[in-house]
Swiss-Prot record:
Residues 434-447, 475-484 have a biased composition (Low complexity). Residues 434-539 are annotated as: Disordered. Residues 509-528 have a biased composition (Polar residues). This is Trigger factor.
Length: 539
């Protein structure tokens, strides 16, 4: 058997296998025996007709057809072993000739992606930390205070005053057309607005001051030239607002704030704590910006050759994540697809560009981790396990330790590599070796932002990469253990090395609509224009 290979784009290896006549004849013998056992041949009991009788009765072409599948599959497996080829996904038969010499067939075999990093250590990104001013601290303190507001119904109806909270129904129009059309008979959803010039776009705010409940406000506002929504940028937008209710917002006195925040200290000490949190958050945001920009530049300078199967797998992983989000809200994926008038395969196809970018990012991070030798040693893994179990109830520690040291060991390794990789990239990008100083898992946890919400984080995990010796999935709790995941974020799976003549299936979905609050619950925003000011959105 002679095997030749040719490298083709998209990580495809074209494998041509040439068979000798002896292999063909043996395969025909086996096929004849099978056919004589399956079919009635006049003058012979089943399984007793010799090959030449079977061939004369059914024809050589039928015999070849019976023989070809087993012959090709066996020869293909032998060729893979002979050449040391590990398929990344199912192979595809593209050409077959078993009727005359030379007997051969051609298979396209997806192989692991090729990633050639640039001189990534020559890429640098400055660390630019935003200054925390007194004004910034004042704003954060106002947010703290605002969290403890009490809403009170008005004793007597009166016009809305600055600081009040309005319950409204809003419709928005551009050029006379609604920005988000509703189905016939569908009610306009209710939402709430705080009557504050820093929270509502100019023009609309002024129109709402002084309105009474059960009043309609119809106002046209020129949106800013730099508005984040390009559909309304620099254009006139008509707002039709039905004011349903006006409530008074009662803010606590400043000296009550420490107790309300469960803070043991004075107001000045709470203010200082807030400043420190803002400084820490500003540094964290700057580090995130460096990380994102550095990885972007490395990706742009990296040479990739990715198999289509990797992109499809990544797209499927993204779609599974979104389906899980729908399920959490009691909505089945089938309901979403039906509403969109799309099939799952259509969505996967749409997701491919996003999936390819995510795959590239994961592969680049994986290759940097490998090049930098960030795989942890046994002592690091042991320390990580002990740090994790130390936070658990004592009676659960022994079982958790056993699980972390066995089934969940890859996740433990992943958490270590994630942190080391982030610090190494920041050190390379900024030229500041202090980022390499060891940090405990507790120190690596994300700080709470000064406004009380969780600090925004940048995902530094290595996803979208084929299974490798450097895994960087985030460490999971023992309770989260179930089926192992592959390093590309999907379920672990074995590669079918059989040949398939059909192409690999391909999948995408759109980002969910921006939501706003309706009676305290998140709902789909009926307007694509955000009535909030940029400052309010940062809260």
């Amino acid at each position: 058997m002679k095997v030749t290979t040719e490298k083709k784009p998209r990580s495809i290896l074209e494998l041509t296998v040439e068979l000798d006549k002896q292999q063909i004849e043996k395969a025909l013998d086996r096929a004849a025996r099978r056919m004589s056992q399956k079919y009635n041949i006049p003058g012979f009991r089943k399984g007793k007709a010799p090959r030449f009788i079977v061939e004369n009765y059914f024809g050589r072409e039928a015999l070849l057809e019976e023989a070809s599948d087993d012959l090709i599959q066996k020869a293909f497996q032998d060729a893979l072993k002979q050449e040391g080829i590990e398929p990344y996904a199912q192979a595809h038969l593209t050409d077959v000739n078993l009727t005359e010499a030379p007997y051969r067939f051609t298979v396209e075999v997806p192989v692991a992606p090729t990633v050639v990093l640039p001189d990534y250590r020559a890429i640098h990104v400055p660390l630019e930390i935003e200054e925390v001013t007194d004004e910034t601290v004042n704003h954060a303190m106002e947010i703290r205070r605002d969290r403890h507001v009490v809403l009170r119904a008005l004793d007597e109806p009166r016009p809305a005053q600055p600081g009040d909270q309005l319950t409204v129904q809003i419709e928005t129009f551009v050029d006379g057309e609604p920005l988000n059309p509703r189905a016939e008979g569908e009610d306009i959803p209710q939402s709430t607005l705080v009557l504050d010039p820093e929270r509502i776009v100019p023009g609309l705010y002024e129109a709402l001051v002084g309105v009474s409940p059960n009043t309609m406000v119809d106002v046209t506002v020129r949106m800013s030239d730099d508005h984040e929504n390009e559909r309304v940028r620099g254009r006139d937008v008509r707002f039709v607002v039905n004011v349903l209710d006006v409530q008074e917002r009662l803010l606590p006195e400043w000296d009550e704030l420490p107790a309300l925040e469960n803070f043991e200290g004075t107001l000045d000490e709470l203010r200082e704590k807030t400043r420190n949190e803002l400084i820490e958050a500003a540094r964290k945001n700057a580090e995130d910006d460096v990380f994102v920009e550095y990885v972007r530049q490395v990706i742009a300078a990296t040479t990739f050759d990715l198999p289509d199967a990797l992109i499809v797998r990544e797209a499927d992983s993204i779609l599974r994540e979104r389906e899980a989000e729908f399920e959490r809200y009691g909505i089945s994926a089938e309901q979403i697809y039906a509403a969109q008038g799309k099939k799952r395969d259509d969505l996967i196809e749409e997701l491919k560009p996003v999936a390819e970018e995510r795959a590239k990012r994961g592969l680049v991070l994986r290759e940097i981790a490998k090049a930098e030798g960030l795989a942890p040693d046994e002592s690091e893994i042991a320390r990580e396990v002990e740090d994790i179990v130390a936070s658990m109830e004592e009676e659960r520690r022994d079982s958790a330790r056993t699980l972390l040291e066995t089934e969940l060991r890859p996740f433990v390794v992943a958490g270590i590599v994630d942190r080391k990789l982030r610090r190494r990239i920041l050190a390379i990008a900024t030229g500041d070796p202090s980022f390499e100083q060891a940090a405990s898992p507790e120190a690596a946890s994300e700080p709470e932002s000064a406004d009380g919400g969780e600090a925004q984080t940048v995902d530094t995990h290595i996803d979208s990469a084929p299974v490798d010796d450097v895994s960087t999935k985030q460490a999971a709790s023992p309770e989260a253990a179930s089926e192992p995941e592959s390093a590309d974020g999907g379920e672990a799976q074995t590669v079918d090395t059989h040949i398939n003549s059909a192409p690999v299936d391909d999948v995408s979905t759109e980002t969910p609509i921006v939501s706003q609050e309706e009676n305290g619950e998140s709902v789909e925003n009926q307007s694509v224009v955000d009535v909030a000011t940029p400052e309010a959105r940062t809260e």
